[in-house]
Amino acid sequence: KGHPFEYREFDKEGRVTIRDYSKQTIENFNKLKLDCLFVLGGDGTLQLAHQFFELGLPVIGIPKTIDNDLVGTDYTFGYQTAVQVACDALDRLHTTGESHQRVMILEVMGRDAGWIALEAGLAGRAHIILIPEIPYQLEKVLEKIHLRKEGGSPFSIIVVAEGAKEIGKDAITSEL
């Protein structure tokens, strides 16, 4: 695994040298008499494929993202699996949250799109769902938790997409 345009090599002292192996990659492609490079991947992989395309390599890019945020598609590769895994986790969190009377939080993928959080949260009976597309007010989240407790439900399940953010603030992941 590596980036052929910026491949990192380490010497015995731990120093890093960055080398460009793109020409060698194209030479090997031609030596093997290949017709086309099929690339299945996300943003980074397809950007890399585009660099090869710009150098004259015939490329077909097939987008893959579990975020389900590609225009013109109903579902993307990996999305339904991600939702199923999140639903399985929510089933387990329900049991623990209810028996121990706790607030349980499940963070799922979704830097810019909250589809996984939304679908898994609805299917998995989450009480609160936070997504990047709709900034939230922390006070409202706390209010919902307290209302549930006052109403006889001493536990809450929250699903948070990784890109969810409070109104007027950056996403939590931007601080890391």
Pin down the residues of each PLM region.
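Short, conserved acidic/polar surface loops in the N-terminal third of protein domains
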Residues: E9-E13, L48-F52, V71-T73
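N-terminal entry module detector
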Residues: R19, L46-Q47, G61-P63
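Acidic/polar active-site rim loop that often engages polyanionic ligands
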Residues: I62-Y75, E98-S99, A123-G124
